[in-house]
Amino acid sequence: MSRLIKMIVKCYHSVRLLLCMEGYKRAEYIRKHNLFGSMGENCYFHPWKMPGDPELIFIHDNVKIASDVTFINHDISNALLNTKYKTNKFKYFTASTEIFDNVLIGTGTIILPGKKIGPNCVVGGGNSSLQGCA
């Protein structure tokens, strides 16, 4: 699929998610249309914005994600370093995020690249995710 078509499809799904006012319906829409790497059962997804690399997000069962949670699955510091040092040796970094069963993620949390949030965790609002269980 061409890059332009992918962008159009992503915009379409973003608008459709905005129309799903309720978090359980959003999670169901994400699961039904395979927008993430995976979306488990009985999930709640309230963020308004779609992650940049949604295929790198894996959410297990009974996960509740509050509003204004941001998923970051890439790091573009390579652009800065390659320009500064006039090289191409610094590579673009992406990593998947996995959220295991029975997790609550509070409002305003930032989930950083490559993080795994273990089962039965509560991540308080406004935090940057740490590996494991907070």
Predicted region positions:
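Terminal amphipathic alpha-helical/low-complexity segments used for targeting or macromolecular assembly
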Residues: 1-42, 77-78, 120
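Generic detector of intrinsically disordered, low-complexity, polar/charged segments
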Residues: 20, 34-37, 103-105, 111, ...
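Flexible, glycine/small-residue-enriched loop-and-beta-strand segment within the central core
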Residues: 26, 45-117, 132-133
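C-terminal/domain-terminus segments
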Residues: 7-10, 115-130
